[in-house]
């Protein structure tokens, strides 16, 4: 039975690497945000607005506990998931946790391209975006660093890099 939780900041590649890794290993893939959206028929943004951060984080925690019961699965968590309640410890108890560590400049490049799709980032200038990323990483690093495995995920820009990362992650996890 395999349970792998991918954690890291938005734009770290949790979904990109998670899907590719799950496919390679014949595992199921779950994006926790998508799982929540499917269950409640609302976007994460809508749930956040309706319930506030505390209400959303409690809901997220319940959904994390639900998906942690699944077997043979790779779970891509929300960027903030490890930072609330006992979520990080819970994931460590339930399976392997992998922190996808990405340099701030790489996150900036990835998020700058997709910032209109991310409400938190949509109206930020380049300077504000970089500051936002650095501040968030500083706050979240103590939680992310509790992962059982650290994996550098700076190179996920094309199929070759993604496959190389999948191969490296397999070796790291002895799979």
Curated annotation (Swiss-Prot):
GO terms for biological process: amino acid biosynthetic process; aromatic amino acid family biosynthetic process; chorismate biosynthetic process. Substrate binds at residues 33, 57, 79, 140. It catalyses: shikimate + ATP = 3-phosphoshikimate + ADP + H(+). Pfam families: SKI (PF01202). Gene3D superfamilies: P-loop containing nucleotide triphosphate hydrolases (3.40.50.300). Its EC number is 2.7.1.71. Mg(2+) binds at residue 15. NCBIfam families: PRK13949.1 (NF010555). Belongs to the shikimate kinase family. This is Shikimate kinase. It comes from Phocaeicola vulgatus (strain ATCC 8482 / DSM 1447 / JCM 5826 / CCUG 4940 / NBRC 14291 / NCTC 11154) (Bacteroides vulgatus). The lineage of its organism: Bacteria, Pseudomonadati, Bacteroidota, Bacteroidia, Bacteroidales. The gene is aroK.
């Amino acid at each position: 039975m395999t349970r792998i939780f991918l954690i890291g900041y938005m734009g770290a590649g949790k979904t990109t690497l998670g899907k590719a890794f799950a496919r390679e290993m014949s595992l199921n893939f779950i994006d926790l945000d998508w799982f929540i959206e499917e269950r409640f028929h609302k976007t994460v943004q809508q749930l956040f607005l309706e319930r506030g951060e505390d209400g959303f984080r409690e809901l997220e925690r319940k959904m994390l506990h639900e998906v942690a019961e699944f077997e043979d699965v790779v779970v891509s968590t929300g960027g903030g998931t490890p930072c609330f309640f006992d979520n990080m410890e819970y994931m460590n108890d339930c399976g392997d946790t992998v922190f996808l560590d990405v340099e701030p400049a790489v996150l900036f490049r990835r998020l700058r391209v997709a910032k209109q799709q991310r409400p938190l980032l949509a109206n930020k200038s380049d300077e504000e975006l970089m500051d936002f990323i650095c501040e968030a990483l500083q706050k979240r690093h103590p939680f992310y660093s509790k992962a059982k495995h650290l994996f550098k995920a700076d190179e996920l820009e094309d199929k070759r890099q993604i496959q190389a990362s999948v191969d490296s992650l397999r070796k790291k996890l002895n799979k």
